[in-house]
UniProtKB/Swiss-Prot annotation:
Cell location: Nucleus, Nucleolus; Nucleus, Nucleoplasm
Protein name per its UniProtKB record: Ribosome biogenesis protein WDR12 homolog
UniProt repeat feature WD, residue ranges: 104-142, 143-185, 192-231, 250-288, 290-329, 335-375, 379-417
Membership in a protein family: Belongs to the WD repeat WDR12/YTM1 family.
Region: Ubiquitin-like (UBL) domain, residue numbers: 10-92
Biological process, per Gene Ontology: maturation of 5.8S rRNA from tricistronic rRNA transcript (SSU-rRNA, 5.8S rRNA, LSU-rRNA); maturation of LSU-rRNA from tricistronic rRNA transcript (SSU-rRNA, 5.8S rRNA, LSU-rRNA)
CDD domains: WD40
UniProt entry keywords in alphabetical sequence: Nucleus, Repeat, Ribosome biogenesis, rRNA processing, WD repeat
Species this protein is from: Drosophila melanogaster (Fruit fly)
Gene3D superfamilies linked: YVTN repeat-like/Quinoprotein amine dehydrogenase (2.130.10.10)
Chief location category: nucleus
GO molecular function terms noted in the UniProt entry: ribonucleoprotein complex binding
Functional note: Required for maturation of ribosomal RNAs and formation of the large ribosomal subunit.
Entries under InterPro entries matching the protein: G-protein_beta_WD-40_rep, NLE, WD40/YVTN_repeat-like_dom_sf, WD40_repeat_CS, WD40_repeat_dom_sf, WD40_rpt, WDR12/Ytm1
Amino acid sequence: MDVDNGEGQVQVHLKTKQEHYAVPDVPYAIDGTVTTVELNTFVNALLRQKDGSSDTDFDFLVFDEYLRGRLCDHLREKAISFEDAIEIEYVERFPAPEPQDCLLHDDWVSAVKARGKWILSGCYDNTLNLWTNKGKHILTISGHTAPIKAVDWISLDEETGRFVSTSQDQTAMLWQWNVGSNSVECVSVCKGHERGVDSVSVSPDGLRFATGSWDTMLKVWSAELDDAVEGSSKRMKESGVRTPKITLQGHRESVSAVQWMDATTLLTGSWDHTLKVWDLSLEGIKTEISTNKSIFDASYSKLNRLILTASADKNLRLYDPRTNQGSVVRNTYLGHNAWVQTVMWSTTEEFLFVSGAYDNQNKLWDCRSPKAPLYDLLGHGEKVLDIDWSNPKYIVSGGVDNTVRVFKSRKALAEEAETK
């Protein structure tokens, strides 16, 4: 057997956590040059022998990484002996998201957030827009005096929606939307930053929100409607002006990303090449991770407790904030052809995330597949500025082509199939 050339056979065990797809747990001898194509054929043949199953598309994990070429090359790259019995895990392939809608705006769409039946977008023409997730325009909201940079929902029920927006006009604005009358009012203007406000995130309980700015500051504000700012003048209270509860200094350049990790912990990413984890109970930095690029966006997963970054190059990077080796990258994801502007973990699928870049493309990834995305989500004609997967049914993105693109994910596709 000429193992060095990947010829000959390899002993494998085929495993799956999806019990209805399980095959007999015995060693199989397969050619070392197989790819996912041949493995799919082999597994489906075994399933037909077992119970007459129709063919299913699978992906294959070998040592916790998706197989994307020949098995022998994969093993050689990981320095795995060809003499060992190899365990291959197979999983049903995640279906390709399908394009649903293109929502036309009057200017660049720099911020987008979906919740329930609704999509909130923010534009460079200083306006916010509300849409249904079926593509119907509901409302245009004016108030900011410079381009919108970020948006987030505070709360939503059948009668009322509340959300926050941030802008290059150095403010954040709190809004209350009456769903029935389709009217909206600005409840508070949040002042305290000295430059544009680039990022925003609402706390898990909806009582606070955090903002990051070009002034390098991280600020935490009350999101409660009846909040009275201690020490504020009567004029400020009556005019709805709100000031921050906490101001945290530590970054040296723009705070381009902010996210609540839990009720008392915040993650920030910055153009100063660092990620910081903040402990609000101590009002200080808990962990700092140094990177080698400016960070445009960062996303933390509550499911796997890992952090992804989008940076001033073509790559996405994965970090573990729990490690003692703060600068070590756990994985790098290659696939975009220009700067990656935006990234977000799935809120329901532990291994999946989406990204958008200046190459006009969105991509859907599995964090166990660093060499290639699962799918390209095409449609934008210009740079992608923001992407959101808050609603598990829909992947939503905004870009320089003045559009919001809506893609149906597996949950929406499954619901459609059930109703047919």
